Amino acid sequence: MFLTVKEIRKHFGEGDSRVEVLNGIDAEIEKGEICVLLGPSGSGKSTLLNIIGGIDSADSGYIAINGEKTADMNEKRLTLYRRKHLGYIFQQYNLIPNLNIKENVEIGAYLSDNPLDTDEILKTLGLYEHRHKLPNQLSGGQQQRTAIGRAIIKNPDILLCDE
């Protein structure tokens, strides 16, 4: 199994304000499969993606890539895991305002041993003619496509998309 999510539990708050957000989540995903998380606002979708991506930690349970638990990885190995295997499209795309669109996409390539061609990605996403513009010169949809380009340029094994 390429990605294993096992018994993931996460809560926020304590005492009377304690809220169980994730309660024993399991999933097994092979390379090339598509898995979609559906649920209402506040149901823990973003939290689970953040745990898979190593941005947050679970209260219990584990994430494994090719059988290796991410919790057992030292910081160097976890960074390598993120660089090699993960692309992440955040709900808020957080483009760097003083870099043009091409430079914003190319940032993702620095984290890869085998990046895709920047110009080809920009053409595919309909952004090539905007490559020298700054993020604030684009529409919200164009900015989101720039964030998608940044996530896919490193040709990740796992692409986590948060809305």
Predicted regions and their residues:
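Conserved catalytic motifs of ABC-family nucleotide-binding domains
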Residues: 155
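Conserved ABC ATPase signature
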Residues: 134-144
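ABC ATPase NBD coupling module
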Residues: 70-87
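Catalytic Walker B motif of ABC-type/P-loop ATPase nucleotide-binding domains
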Residues: 159-162
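Helix-to-loop junction immediately C-terminal to a conserved catalytic motif
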Residues: 53
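Conserved ABC transporter NBD signature motif
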Residues: 61-69
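Short coil-to-helix segment of the ABC ATPase nucleotide-binding domain corresponding to the Q-loop/switch region
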Residues: 99-106
